[in-house]
Design a protein with these regions (language model features):
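Short, solvent-exposed loop/turn segments at secondary-structure boundaries
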Residues: 8-11, 117-120, 154-156
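Outer-membrane beta-barrel "beta-signal"
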Residues: 132-137, 159-170
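Repeated loop/turn-to-beta-strand initiation elements of outer-membrane beta-barrel proteins
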Residues: 26-31, 99-103, 134-143
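One face of beta-strands
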Residues: 17-19, 33, 126-130, 141
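Strand-loop-strand
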Residues: 115, 120-136
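Residue-level signature of outer-membrane beta-barrel architecture
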Residues: 21-23, 93-95, 134-136, 145-147, ...
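Outer-membrane beta-barrel translocator/channel fold
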Residues: 39-52, 141, 147-161
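C-terminal outer-membrane beta-barrel translocator/porin domains of Gram-negative envelope proteins
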Residues: 1-97, 105-109, 113-115
Length: 170
C-alpha cells in the first residue's frame, strides 16, 4: 500500500497477481500461458487514483494486436485514461524452426476497467498472430505480427501491428 503515513501523497492499495504456466506439448513444442489481474483502490483522503498510477494494457508485452496502452477507457481525444482494474491473458505455442530460430503463434486478450471489474468475453480485446525468436546468449530477440480481433468479429487483415521484442514476453 501507499500511505501518507509512509511518506506518500496518496493513500491506495495496489495489487497484481500473475500466473505463468509452461508445458511441453510434443518434444520441442512448448505451450506458454499467462494470466494477470491487477487492482488499485484508494482509501483515506484519496478519492481518485491519478492517471500515472492506473493500469494500462496493449502492446508487445501485454496484448499484442493493439498499440501501446490503447486498450480500455479513453478521453474525447482518444487518449488512454487507464483504469483501476486490469485483466490480461496470453497463450503462445513455441516451436523450433532451425538452430537458434524459433517460431510462435499466439492469442492474447485483456481489458482495462475504469472503476468496476466484470469479466465478460465480449468486453475483452483479443489479438492473434505469429512471430519468430532468435535465441542469443543474452536472451531471445523477436518480431511479431499481430491482428486485433474486435468484438469477436472476423480478422481485418488490413489492421495489424509489428512488434520488436527483447527477452520473453512471459
Amino acid at each position: 500500500p501507499a500511505s501518507s503515513h509512509l511518506g506518500s501523497e496518496l493513500d491506495f492499495f495496489k495489487g497484481v497477481t500473475e500466473c505463468h504456466l509452461y508445458g511441453v506439448l510434443i518434444k520441442d513444442i512448448i505451450v506458454a500461458s499467462r494470466l494477470k489481474f491487477g487492482s488499485i483502490r484508494p482509501y483515506g483522503f484519496t478519492t481518485d487514483i491519478p492517471i500515472y498510477k492506473r493500469f494500462f494494457s496493449g502492446g508487445s508485452y501485454s496484448v499484442r494486436g493493439f498499440g501501446y496502452q490503447q486498450i480500455g477507457p479513453k478521453d474525447a481525444d482518444g487518449n488512454p485514461l487507464g483504469g483501476d482494474y486490469q485483466f490480461e491473458g496470453n497463450i503462445e505455442l513455441r516451436y523450433p524452426i532451425a538452430g537458434n530460430l524459433k517460431g510462435v503463434v499466439f492469442m492474447d486478450t485483456g481489458n482495462i476497467y475504469a472503476t468496476s471489474f466484470s469479466l465478460n468475453a465480449y468486453d475483452l480485446s483479443y489479438g492473434v498472430g505469429t512471430g519468430m525468436r532468435y535465441v542469443t546468449p543474452i536472451g531471445p530477440v523477436g518480431i511479431d505480427l499481430a491482428f486485433p480481433v474486435i468484438h469477436l468479429r472476423p480478422i481485418d487483415l488490413s489492421s495489424y501491428y509489428f512488434y520488436l521484442t527483447i527477452g520473453q514476453g512471459f
